A protein has these predicted regions:
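Surface-exposed, short loops/turns at beta-strand junctions within beta-sandwich domains
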Residues: 96-98, 105-115
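Short beta-strand elements
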Residues: 125-144
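Short beta-strand segments within Ig-like beta-sandwich modules, predominantly Fibronectin type-III
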Residues: 90-100
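N-terminal export/targeting and maturation segments
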Residues: 1-24
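Short amphipathic beta-strand/extended segments with alternating polar/hydrophobic composition
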Residues: 8-16, 80-84, 131
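Mature extracytoplasmic domains of secretory-pathway proteins
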Residues: 18-86
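Beta-strand-rich interaction surfaces with strong enrichment in secreted/lumenal proteins
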Residues: 42-45, 91, 105-107
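Internal, hydrophobic beta-strand segments that form the core of beta-sheet-rich folds
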Residues: 111-125
Length: 144
């Protein structure tokens, strides 16, 4: 996954995820990981009204389950205070007629720093396995 702001990009990793896939004839395997989110500013924005883009570098359509922004972190580094629901638009990225990625566009105001929580799910990664893929991302934007 990549975050694009001000014509610059940075990679974003998930801090929590679960994936299921086929593991041979009639069986499935799952991979689950859980960590601690870090909201270190991943990118600097040069104006109050930012228009970041997030690219999911896979052909499966992500479904945004929750996307929230916060202005504060507590003493332990967790988001605190009122949350703002972020509205975003999702579009396909095509190359030679094939979907190669999905672009999530959103607008936000960055006065000083903003901290974001994004939870997504993906349609069945393997039709033989009933679980969807899920991932949680945390990132920050900082005003220059």
């Amino acid at each position: 996954m990549e975050l694009h702001v001000n014509n610059e990009q940075t990679g974003l990793g998930s801090w929590s995820y679960s994936w299921s896939s086929g593991a041979g004839r009639g069986s499935c395997s799952s991979l689950v990981a859980d960590g601690i989110p870090t909201y270190e500013p991943d990118a600097k924005v040069d104006s109050l009204h930012a228009r970041p883009r997030i690219y999911f570098l896979r052909d499966q359509r992500p479904r945004v389950q929750s996307f929230r922004a916060y202005s504060e972190l507590d003493e332990n580094g967790w988001t605190t205070g009122p949350a703002e629901r972020i509205r975003a638009r999702l579009s396909r990225v095509r190359q030679d007629g094939e979907v190669v990625a999905w672009k999530l566009r959103f607008r936000t105001e960055v006065v000083d720093e903003r901290y974001f929580d994004l939870d997504v799910s993906f349609e069945k990664l393997d039709r033989r396995c009933g679980d969807n893929g899920e991932a949680s991302y945390a990132f920050g934007l900082e005003r220059e």
